Amino acid sequence: MIKKRAIFERMFPIPPPHCPPNNKNNFYHLTTDTKDPLLLRILRTIGYVLLHIITLGLLLLIHYYKHHRVVRKEGLPTPPTLPKGPEPKTIEIAKQPPKDGEDKKPDVPKPGTPPPEDTPPPPPKAPSPASPKVPKQPADKKPTPPPEAPPPPVRVATPMPLRPSSQGYWQCLNRMVSMVLRRAPLPLPAMQVDPILGDFNPHFVASYPNRIDNEPMYFQIKQFKKIAQNPDLPQQHRRLAQLSLEQALYLNDNYYLVNVPGDGNCFYRAYAVGWLSALYEESSRNDIVFEQEATRLLDLPFASSSPANANLCAEMAELLQLCSTYCSFIDLYDGVILSQKHTATLIAFLRKLSAYAIRQQIAASSNEETARALFISDMQDDLLPSVLEFLAANRPYSELFQNLIDHSALPYMQSRDKLFLLLEHLPALFLTDAELQKMSPEDQQLRKQYEREIREAFAKLSRRIADSGWDTERFNAIVKDYLPEAIRCQYSRFLATIENRRSGDLPWSPALSFFAFLCTCPSVRFHKLCATFYKSLEDIIIASAPPQRSIQEILQISNASLSYLNEDLDSSWQREVISSNIMTILTTHESLTLESSMPQLETLHKRIANLLKNVISTSFETPPLSNQPDLLSNLVNKLLVAIHSKLELKEHFNTVCSARSLRLTRDEGSGLSQEQDLLYTQAVQLLFFILQHPQVNNRPETKDAVKELKMLLLPFLQYAFKKVENEKKLQKLLRSILGSLVLKPPARYPSTPSNKDKETFCKFWSRHPEVMVLDPILEKNCMQFLRATFPNYQLETEAILLEKEIESTFRNGWNVFLTRLNLFGSKLGSPSSPTALSDQFSKSFLIFCFLNNYPKLLQKKTPLAARLDAFQREASHRFTQVKDKLLLSLKYGFPLATATINQYSRARDQLICNLLKNTVTASDGFCRSGFRQSLIGYLHSLSSNELGDILDDVKEQAEANDVAAMTTVPLQPFAVCLIMSDRDTVSEENIENFVAMHGFLNTISPERDARIFLIRFPNHYGCLLPRNPRTEDQNSKPDSSNP
């Protein structure tokens, strides 16, 4: 029996159980059919796992395309769905007169196709051209005969001529918000984040309208609730959170938010969105609103102010006409508001319009001088670097060189500021015998008379100081006897300088002399005793110089000596600017590492370092400082120990010491030992390190030693910068550096320059050939190209003849052009360029570059201009012919040259920002705003119209006056809402003024009167679109599909 059963089981095997045990699915496939090969069982298991993976992937793909599908970047948009036309039967019924007792309203369409809101049904007999055509009745069917009595007219709304079947504005707005809430596919310009890259979308123009509570980045409603309900927080914080919450809820109930890019044009972008939206909403009541707005634009005074503005208004009117042709608000939004081209037109129009309105307001309420001051005040915040770039690109170089580099005009000063300026440069008011002998006998007498008047004026001021309590006895007892030896030594050197410059016996008191010393070396004022004394005398001197009196009246200078007084004020200001600019360069971060890209910096640093070392060694090798041999060494060693105790400071200090300009060699003729020479070299290197890395002033391990060393060494540097004998040398050093700042190479080159980059360089080089000296390989290639190709016999012969006429006719421009070349190109007489750069070029190439810089000379109707024009056309043709050879020569080494040019551009930008920074006397006692004041003084020489043009070009974003100016423009009225949580604009003092208006400003337009609604976030604007109450309930809850 058992054998029969075994035979039966082998013939008919019992199948395995259909359901595996729980949690044993894979184990089931491995254990079932154990007689199968192991490989087969493993493949069966793998197939089972892959089946699960494929199934899960299909489910995820279906979910993605249902809820998270992304719109394509390219392709045609989905055409709008037009509403169905009325049925023929409905038209026949509409023609019949209503019977008594019946409602005279037309029949309502079926619920399946609701009519657009706020849009009347189309007229029965005159459907507009763009609406769907009504099907024709069969030819054999006769029309319904008219009734005997004429029926009363059926009231129907007049259709819009250009948008006959347009969908309602509120219906479209609701649909757009629903798309955002459902995460439906949106146009690419409406998405802030690129759906493919997952990064910021560079094509973003404006978002679709969204609910306020769906914008947590701007309205942190949950955070507001949490703070408002937290009893542990201060009352003012909870109140601010509660007010911010109430404002957010109010805005959420009444508005949708449209966000725009924060590129500086956010105000104009938001205004454009609100403007077009308001016009489209009004078009449901006024069919020709866009045409009326276009006509209003063309009638603005702005349209007739200039041809450019007239063209801009005409372009804007065409855009408004285009807006009137769209069939729905969504089409308008996608076609115009989300268009990069149309948005650029809107921004340009609104920017120019607001700028014109500002100018009209200033012209109507201010004179020319006040208008200039207003424009310049708008530039002084952060726009001065951009203003300088604009001037360098658009103004003649001769003007900039004369006003910013060669000679800085004395700015407007009050009488007391001029008096302090004279005291700061007191030794220079008295000439030496050698300087006096260079003058004519008559001028010598006038100069001596002027110096007598100056001595008498300061003697009178000394008596006033003594009468105020600071006589010689008190000064000696309180101040002089308690001065440190280092300050007393520097004060003695200051007095000796005055006596050596023909001042004779000082007729003024020691108190006034020491006050002038503190003005010359302001870092000494950081000594507590000196600071107290300076403040006491400063109040006395200010009281002696009332603002209503001129400096001539205060000092009682005669009219015969007035010219010398003005000369001294001007020369004192020049030295002030020189010392300020040099100190700014020395304190520019990493200026020592920029020496390789700007050779003039290395020369300046080396000259200053040698000057400082010589002054220090001379002072400490002669009495009275020679009597304290350990004074300097103790301070130097103390600071070196502190620096080497921190690895970070040690690395920075080693970088400073490795600069080529600070590798000071020992002068064998100085008589200094190696230990003394090393000490003075280390002192110079430490001072440069302090100036380059100001953080050591506050570090606990270095601040005490730094303070003492600066107190000891900085006065030497400050006094050297203002010494008359050093003025010309320092000015020569500065002219080369400041002159190079006007040279702005093209934009940053890539690491692998293309042929287009090479052509850009060639074009720039034809105007600024001095740029080639930045890189030795580039300079070599360019000079080889010039020697081999450009000197043409005919051109060179003509150039030699033209050079003499150009020099005599356009002397100023020609000299400035050569000066610019040689300032930047000569590298201050370094061995690599012993001769001037202009002498290394052929005459034909030199005149070719000169005319590229001054193309207006070719437009004059003179015989010389005709010859220059013919020469320039021939030279340009020659340069274009041989340019390929230059491009070929740039094939090798150009990437390295562009890296050097990029490094120079970075150094240039850094220096410009520091030179134009608004600073006062800092912790080191230097005022670094000389170049800034020179630029502002030059701007005051321009007209208000020129300043307005500059401001319009460099302004990066809409300022408060731009927003206020738009209220005077006869367009749609707009309101601005400030969010309560912005602490920069809404303070605790004025927050009550915004509570009643929910943050809206009454100073612009009240909320109830506005058609355009803007909201201001911290440094950003957005647009608010009013919600339709009939669709409010529909969007009050987020869609269930929204995750």
Swiss-Prot record:
Biased composition regions of type Basic and acidic residues, renumbered to the chain: 86-108
Superkingdom per UniProt: Bacteria
Region (Disordered): 74-162
Annotated PROSITE patterns: OTU
Domain OTU: 255-349
Bias (Pro residues) ranges: 109-132, 144-154
Protein name according to UniProt: Uncharacterized protein CPn_0483/CP_0271/CPj0483/CpB0503
